[in-house]
């Protein structure tokens, strides 16, 4: 029994499903626009096994900090396969990254000032730069990322990347957070309008992330609108570029930066029911596990109860709650069905923003396991006290 060896709470990683998702998404876009690739969003789930698989499958690493950049390098990703986005960058690490051949998408004019110094200090090195672009897509949000394409600052950076001898202008990039399909044609058309207006077709066009992934029907039903599939995203975006570029001699590489779309259904969380009580007519089961382990709030996650041999009872509108001392730490509201102490609960669709956003709150985090056939691979050991507190002075 896995619990006997690894404890009463752990994550289960599915590396095979991750590879299937990556290839399916990539090939769906390529069927419409062949010169296409994926830059995997490390922030969504930076488990090294996933990152290594992306590199093995020919994808890029999309990082937003020097920490994530270091993850990519330790996973064996070459600098020229790393795309560094993000609003704030450590200037020393950025210099090392650019001199080594990495690609930086510049987010603001202050970052450009830093880059000018780097380029001057390294005249014999080619500095690879992209520009993060911000324009209207009709989603009701004024995005905080990138340059307003109608601003003076945008003109300044465009002039710089075109006129500086040792700077190689790589790409335009954008990122808009809303995942609904109706906003995807607008981000693609906005980019096409930009390159058409400027008369510049870069060697790469990067239209960012913000895609729904695969999920159980019970989870889909809790969203107000339709959950698009890979084909719908591809038709909404890749078709725009295929049509615009069909008569052009240059066919730039098209990139998206998905996270949830490829990793969302590739991790489960397993917890154990420890107590069941009735408080003023409401049944409450406390689990070794927390909402902070699954990072899904406001919805009931896809959940399965596995009887572990103890006595079960039938319950109605029972809440499964976490081990923390927070009233709102509820994993599942109003469960109807059988449940017993020491039963296992398995929560699906935990791949996105779960492991990476679990704080060192109340308890250290649990191990991550990959079950490959009959073999159990430890992807991340369970944390212990010293993992969290060795940086404190006692």
Sequence positions of predicted segments:
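A charged N-terminal "starter" segment
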Residues: 3-127, 155, 159-168, 196-201, ...
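Conserved, mostly hydrophobic/aromatic
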Residues: 18, 43, 65, 97, ...
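Active-site-proximal loop/turn and secondary-structure-junction residues that shape catalytic pockets
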Residues: 44-46, 67-68, 88-90, 108-110, ...
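Short acidic, glycine/serine/threonine-rich loops at helix termini
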Residues: 51, 74, 94-98, 115-118, ...
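Residue-level marker for buried hydrophobic side chains located in beta-strands
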Residues: 61-62, 129, 205, 254
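Histidine-centered active-site/metal-ligand motif
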Residues: 85, 173-175, 304
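Active-site loop/helix belt of alpha/beta enzymes
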Residues: 135-272
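Charged (often Lys/Glu-rich) extended helix/loop segments that serve as interaction or gating elements
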Residues: 236-238, 242-245, 249-394
């Amino acid at each position: 029994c896995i619990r006997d060896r690894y404890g009463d709470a752990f994550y289960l990683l599915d590396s095979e499903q991750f590879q299937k998702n990556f290839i399916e998404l990539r090939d769906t876009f390529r069927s419409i626009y062949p010169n296409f690739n994926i830059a995997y969003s490390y922030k969504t789930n930076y488990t090294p096994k996933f990152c290594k698989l992306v590199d093995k499958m020919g994808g890029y690493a999309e990082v937003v900090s020097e920490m994530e950049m270091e993850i990519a390098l330790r996973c064996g990703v070459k600098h020229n396969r790393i795309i560094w986005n993000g609003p704030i960058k450590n200037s020393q690490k950025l210099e090392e990254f650019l001199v080594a051949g990495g690609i930086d998408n510049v987010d603001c004019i202050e970052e450009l000032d830093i880059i000018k110094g780097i380029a001057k200090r390294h005249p014999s090195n080619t500095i690879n730069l992209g520009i993060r672009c911000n324009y209207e897509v009709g989603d009701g949000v004024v995005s905080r990322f990138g340059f307003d394409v109608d601003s003076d600052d945008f003109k300044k950076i465009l002039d710089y990347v075109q006129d500086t001898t040792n700077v190689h202008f790589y790409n335009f990039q954008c990122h808009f957070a809303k995942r609904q399909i109706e906003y995807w044609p607008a981000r693609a058309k906005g980019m096409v309008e930009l390159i058409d207006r400027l008369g510049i077709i870069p060697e790469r066009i990067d239209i960012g992330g913000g895609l729904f992934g695969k999920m159980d029907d019970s989870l889909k039903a809790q969203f107000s609108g339709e959950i698009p599939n890979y084909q719908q995203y591809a038709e909404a975006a890749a078709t725009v570029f295929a049509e615009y570029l069909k008569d052009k001699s240059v066919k730039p590489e098209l990139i998206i930066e998905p996270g949830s779309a490829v990793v969302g259904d590739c991790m489960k969380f397993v917890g154990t029911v420890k107590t069941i009580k009735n408080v003023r007519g409401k049944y409450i089961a406390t689990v070794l596990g927390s909402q902070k382990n699954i990072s899904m709030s406001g919805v009931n996650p896809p959940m399965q109860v596995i009887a572990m041999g103890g006595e079960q009872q039938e319950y109605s509108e029972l809440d499964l709650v976490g081990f923390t001392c927070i009233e709102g730490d509820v994993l599942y509201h109003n469960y109807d069905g059988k449940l017993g102490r020491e039963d296992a609960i398995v929560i699906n669709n935990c791949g996105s923003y779960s492991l990476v956003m679990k704080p060192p709150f109340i308890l250290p985090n649990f191990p991550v396991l990959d079950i490959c056939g009959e073999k159990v691979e430890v992807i991340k050991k369970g944390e212990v006290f010293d993992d969290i507190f060795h940086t404190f002075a006692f």
